[in-house]
Amino acid sequence: MLKSFLIFLVRFYQKNISPAFPASCRYRPTCSTYMIEAIQKHGLKGVLMGIARILRCHPLAHGGNDPVPDHFSLRRNKTDISD
């Protein structure tokens, strides 16, 4: 139930708030999509993963492919950092 509500909040952001600003996420998937996938895969710990990802996403970040890892981690998924 809480997971569904958190995902609803992120989707609300994606549909109603995000379009008002230029795209700026340096990662794939985007930070909001990453948050949804992390919540689906890791439950409430996924929220922490999503927040850590948002904090990593800044103009000096290298960006690139950073999928949600299969195990809980607050660090970047380094399976494919060649992008």
From Swiss-Prot:
Record's compositionally biased regions (Basic and acidic residues): 68-83
Region annotation (Disordered) ranges: 63-83
Principal subcellular localisation of the protein: membrane
Record keywords, A-Z: Cell membrane, Membrane
Stored InterPro entries: Membr_insert_effic_factor_YidD
A GO-annotated cellular component: plasma membrane
Keyword Cell inner membrane: no
Coiled coil, from the record: none
Membrane topology: Peripheral membrane protein
Localization, UniProt: Cell membrane
Function comment: Could be involved in insertion of integral membrane proteins into the membrane.
NCBIfam families noted in UniProt: membrane protein insertion efficiency factor YidD
HAMAP family per UniProt: UPF0161_YidD
Family: Belongs to the UPF0161 family.
Descriptive protein name: Putative membrane protein insertion efficiency factor
Species this protein is from: Streptococcus agalactiae serotype V (strain ATCC BAA-611 / 2603 V/R)
